[in-house]
Amino acid sequence: MKLIVNADDFGYSKGVNLGIVEAHREGVVTSATLMVNMEGFEHAVGLAKEHPTLGVGIHLVLTCGSPVSQDVPSLTDGEGRFRRGQDHLISAVPEEIERELRAQLGRFVAAGLKLTHIDSHHHVHAHPAILPIVLKLAEEYRVPVRYPWLFGTQEKRDQLSILTTEGFSHHFYGDDLTVQSFVRIVEDMADYPVVEIMTHPAYLDEAVLTGSSYAKQRTTELKILTAAELKQYIHDQKIQLVTFSELG
């Protein structure tokens, strides 16, 4: 098995950034996805350049923080910030969605990073109103997309003609995670050639504590992802840790 361990929310804050880099340098995280509209963006870019073995993709955002582009009223509230949740996306103006996603990709590329793949915050890329736009952008940038697990079956995925992993898990998430939680996820997907596991390691800082409902759990993830027991399991099972750059 080839395993991509992706850390979401790179760029959210300095605490998140430092936790992700620690999970890569001392643990099993191979990949991260960058939020270009958040306060820790520039800090994350610097860390990414210092750690070239960390694959970095983009974490497209339509539900957190503020937009990168101008004049996207169908996506924002009265204060100019993205609306919470996803209910508004079905009625959002497609041209505004595409304009914003293109602006985020443009900021990523302008930072001088190599784009490895595309995923999204709160899985909005799998939303029926968003997925066609994301697939068009992925084709333009010639990069893989996180398996759109909300979209349905393997057959449906194959019909989309996208480059992605055969397996994806969002189950490494919650209040009661252990090393065995991670191991069970890997074992459940043992028949897939290439698998991605989504993670959220971080150190706590004010931005996380005040802005995210998923806070202290991130430190638990960091502890697990750097645990000697987990690294030994991956070694013993001859699992190859890779990034999205190895797809194709």
Swiss-Prot record:
Entries under SUPFAM superfamilies matching the protein: Glycoside hydrolase/deacetylase (SSF88713)
Keyword Magnesium in record: yes
Enzyme class: hydrolase
Biological processes, Gene Ontology terms: polysaccharide catabolic process
Keyword set, alphabetical order: Carbohydrate metabolism, Hydrolase, Magnesium, Metal-binding
Cofactor entry: Mg(2+)
Binding site for Mg(2+): 59, 121
InterPro entries (UniProt xref): COD_ChbG_bac, Glyco_hydro/deAcase_b/a-brl, YdjC-like
Entry's EC annotation: 3.5.1.-
Source organism superkingdom: Bacteria
GO MF entries: deacetylase activity; hydrolase activity, acting on carbon-nitrogen (but not peptide) bonds, in linear amides; metal ion binding
General function of this protein: Probably catalyzes the deacetylation of acetylated carbohydrates an important step in the degradation of oligosaccharides.
HAMAP family: COD
Family according to the record: Belongs to the YdjC deacetylase family.
Protein name, entry field: Carbohydrate deacetylase
Origin species: Brevibacillus brevis (strain 47 / JCM 6285 / NBRC 100599)
